[in-house]
Amino acid sequence: MKILLSPLFAIITTLTLTWLTLLNPTLLQSIDLRISDQLIVKEKEFVEDVVLVDISEKTLEVHGQYPLPRDIYGDLILRLRQANAGVIVFNLSFPEEDRTGQDEGFTLMLPNGVILSHFPSNKAQNRSAYSTAIVQVGGDALDYIYNYPGIAANLEKYENAATGIGIANTLPEIDGVVRRLPMIAGVQDKLYPSIVLEIFKAYT
């Protein structure tokens, strides 16, 4: 105990931490994040009313290469509705016309509970995505969030038909782990809601 309270120990500890910070500026922050992870770890809760539908290797073997024809997605929407799905979310974007000519049928399936995603990009693009109205109070939110120069938007007819469209992006911490999801994102000086926020709006 005397050693821990001695001035020499304090000086050595301070110099060591300073040296480690200079050697690797993100090291202490990474350690702090790992400690926080251990403090908030709790038993996993299983949610039965959320279902994930994945595009598997077997699906690609049956229906061909990705992207799948839009009528397959339309049939999936129909089956999910028959199973009383409240909100249907696509964690992928549809920026191009369907190669099999199924755009019209897919568009008709998008109203009433279908949420599409679009993905921000660091590559500048000419076309802007559909923008959901966001009311700002107390300053410009773009001063505090990352403003992407481009976005991988869906076809305009899809975005006009869908119940909602949200940004699907993640911001990993310095150790590469995703712990938080932004509720809004800036793209080409406009604000876009996250996919999580759009799901919440549609569900409530």
Which residues are covered by each model-predicted region?
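Non-transmembrane functional regions of envelope-associated proteins
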Residues: 2-204
